Amino acid sequence: GVNGSPPPASILQDKDRMATNQDYQISPSSWNRFEECPRKYWLSRQGLPRKASMAASSGTAIHNTVEDLCNLDISDRDEGEMGWLHSTAREALERNWKAERQEFLGTPRHPRWKSEMFSKAHDGLIGALGFLFEKAGLSKRELSEVSIQSWRQVQDIVLETEATLESDCGRMMGRLDLLLLDPSSSEGGVGWIVADLKTGRPPRSGLDEKVRRQLLFYRDLAKQRSPEQNSITAEGWYSSNETIYVAHGPSILEEAIDAWESMKVTEEPFQATPSESACSFCDWKAWCPDWWVSRSEGLLDGSRMFRDEVTELVRLDHDSGAALFERTTPTDQEGSLEGSDYRFGAILKGKALEQIKQ
């Protein structure tokens, strides 16, 4: 490339890839973090304690259950058998829900596990399976009315589940949920569908730009891996409103390479760009002096976002778990702190109490 910059992905061959030492890759999520706030991306690469969330755990349980059902061995079952999918799907979801709960509770930073969200996850699973019926050319139906033969028809269009895609140059990677045959494709031969299952809030109108870019990212990596495939469509499947959104647009791989060039982590922290959108769901606020300063100076309204406080433990009753904390405030841009007049109490239980006793 010009001025010693690496050549674009499109002209790198396998031998070049092997000779190029890559210590990081760009993914849709890391790209989004970097654009929202370079400091957020930098902190995410520092090995800080992870934070779990119910939404993420529930979504993972649904995704893993769809994968399990797509890969289910039903070769020895009678094709006319009915009434099996409802119980099988629920059992698979319960198994994955239990696994996610263990992972959740084993994460250093986590809120309360909400068992009551299982029914919502089950509804999301039913919505996700409905998309597969539609793509296989089957009418919408209750799970109890799905025969073995019908599910085989679904499995026949599934090419891959939870597939990891990597660019030829090794700098870009993505993990897609489903790669399907598209029997309805009108472009010479059977097309493919890159499908990403979304269990969160659906868009009000069109796709969010970040989601659109994520889908195009997967589409373009799939095209690069299989250049002989003429038609590859990228779709976002929103189970909450049972709606499919198609992503359109030109290739974004060159744009991704440009982003990759800027994302090489240095010892010096990247610039922070605090904002309501960047900070609301940031998992690393407690390690960001700019977050504390912005809160302290009233530049951010912390009442409408998840808050990570920097506090000092004033008192703890080891038996009851009753604790008194004092909020600390920043004194400079480097993260120096001092005490304040704001104190608050809390009752600590379970792992939180065990950890603070240490």
What is the role of each PLM region?
Residues 1-17:
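N-terminal amphipathic/basic-hydrophobic helices that include classical n-h-c signal peptides
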Residues 8-10, 68-157:
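A non-catalytic, helix-rich entry segment at domain boundaries
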Residues 24-25, 205-210, 221-302:
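Metal-dependent nuclease catalytic regions and adjoining charged, substrate-binding loops involved
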Residues 31-75, 82, 90, 94, ...:
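Nuclease catalytic cores
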Residues 153-256:
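Mg2+/Mn2+-dependent nuclease catalytic core
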Residues 194-196, 323-330:
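Short, acidic/hydrophobic/Gly-rich beta-strand patch recurrent on exposed beta strands
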Residues 300-321:
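Structural detector for short beta-strands of small beta-barrel domains
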Residues 329-357:
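Beta-strand/loop nucleic-acid-binding surfaces
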